[in-house]
């Protein structure tokens, strides 16, 4: 995009704020970056971006003022501040942050989960009928994974296709589906 903040080793593309997200782009310097996003509601969302990667970060608290604070890993779990900035977000539609793939809910039209969802839905289904159909499928075909819950590590991100193929998941996996 054309509207960015930050500098190497982390640049935030804020060109799509009105669509409900920003894109964090990390250069390939070998360190992990941490982006912390908080809104007026006080909830802080933390996103980690590996070296040379990018991540879509949604504005899930809706329109308002967000504080974005960016850090770079210096050693183990220690991070140094890179930059911080307040962002004014005015969404075109309150649902937009939830309609794009992001670090927590990563999907493409080619994802098995998307293909399955489309195969389950009738062409003339209403939005509510579609939601009900997918909900019923997930609750009938995915069971809670006690072992995974006991051993999950910090930084875990759901893989919706893996959850569907194994038929098991933890709360984060259910939420991503």
Task: Name the predicted role of every residue range.
Residues 1-128:
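N-terminal accessory/pre-domain segments preceding catalytic cores
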Residues 167-171:
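Gly/Ser-rich catalytic serine loop of serine hydrolases
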Residues 173-177:
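Hydrophobic/aromatic-rich core segments of domains that either
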Residues 101-166:
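Secondary-structure boundary elements
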């Amino acid at each position: 995009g054309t509207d960015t903040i930050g500098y190497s080793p982390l640049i935030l593309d804020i060109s799509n704020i009105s669509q409900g997200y920003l894109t964090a782009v990390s250069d390939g310097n070998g360190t992990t970056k941490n982006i912390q996003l908080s809104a007026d509601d006080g909830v802080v969302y933390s996103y980690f971006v590996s070296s040379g990667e990018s991540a879509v970060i949604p504005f899930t608290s809706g329109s308002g003022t967000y504080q974005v604070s960016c850090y770079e890993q210096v050693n183990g779990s220690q991070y140094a501040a890179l930059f911080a900035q307040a962002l004014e977000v005015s969404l075109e539609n309150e649902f937009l942050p939830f309609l794009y793939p992001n670090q927590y809910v990563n999907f493409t039209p080619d994802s098995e989960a998307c293909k399955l969802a489309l195969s389950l839905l009738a062409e003339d289904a209403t939005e509510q009928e579609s939601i009900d159909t997918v909900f019923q499928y997930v609750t009938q075909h995915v069971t809670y994974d006690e072992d995974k819950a006991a051993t999950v590590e910090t930084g875990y991100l759901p893989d919706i296709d893996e959850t569907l193929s194994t038929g098991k998941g933890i709360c984060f996996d259910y939420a991503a589906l």
